[in-house]
């Protein structure tokens, strides 16, 4: 009798712990769930040939702590970015160039941030949480920039986020702001900033501007890594 009562007492807790991540394989269904539950979507984009994608599947996504701590905090969506039309659409829309990539999307499908490459299970929860609501998450950086628009560091960090999203115009503007705020390279941002500005200009088809920026980099900071 005592064993039966104990079993009945712990049964609800056993049922409340997911045994695995509840993956959606249909984008519309995933976002329907996200809107109903007001949870962000984690869209895992992978390819069949991707070794690190398989490693994420066999380790990180099967880790009991990941499942327990994160399983019900997000809506999980997995799509093959090469063979699934919905996966290919997300790949094009968000400029994903490597796998695995985990897009963190709000319930309306807007990108919050992203996690690229293999992340082991012991690092995954902390890194994911930092991207969702940490000070260096995209929303966190937007807030920090609003509070301190003259921070070279914040401008550089948000520029890097834009660059990762292939938003080259916005990236170049904030890299330029970082360079202007650190003209003597005291924070070690101006030389990197000029290099990345040249890259954004090249991606925007502004080849002459890119060459001029590289010349400026070599002139102002001849000892930097990019000038050698």
Residue ranges and their predicted role:
Residues 21-25, 46, 59-86, 99:
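Thiol-based oxidoreductase modules, predominantly thioredoxin-like and allied folds used
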Residues 37-50:
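Short active-site neighborhood of thiol/selenol oxidoreductases, capturing the structured segment around
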Residues 64, 114-118, 148-150, 165, ...:
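Short solvent-exposed coil/turn linkers within tandem alpha-helical repeat scaffolds
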């Amino acid at each position: 009798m005592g064993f039966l009562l104990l079993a009945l007492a712990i049964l609800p807790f056993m049922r409340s712990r997911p045994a695995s991540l509840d993956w959606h394989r249909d984008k519309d269904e995933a976002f329907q769930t996200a809107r109903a539950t007001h949870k962000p979507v984690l869209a895992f984009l992978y390819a069949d040939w991707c070794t690190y994608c398989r490693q994420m599947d066999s380790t990180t996504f099967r880790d009991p702590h990941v499942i327990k701590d994160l399983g019900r905090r997000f809506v999980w969506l997995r799509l093959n970015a090469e063979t699934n039309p919905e996966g290919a659409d997300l790949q094009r829309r968000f400029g994903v160039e490597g796998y695995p990539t985990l897009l963190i999307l709000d319930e309306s499908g807007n990108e919050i941030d992203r996690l690229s490459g293999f992340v082991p299970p012991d690092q995954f929860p902390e890194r994911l949480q930092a991207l969702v609501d940490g000070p260096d998450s995209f929303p966190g950086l937007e807030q920090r920039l609003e509070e301190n628009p003259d921070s070279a560091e914040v401008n550089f960090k948000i520029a890097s986020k834009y660059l990762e999203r292939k938003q080259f115009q916005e990236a170049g503007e904030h890299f330029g702001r970082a360079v202007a705020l650190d003209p003597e390279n005291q924070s070690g941002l101006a030389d990197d900033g000029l290099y990345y500005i040249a890259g954004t200009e090249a991606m925007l088809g502004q080849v002459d501007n890119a060459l001029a920026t590289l010349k400026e980099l070599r002139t102002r900071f001849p000892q930097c890594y990019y000038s050698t």
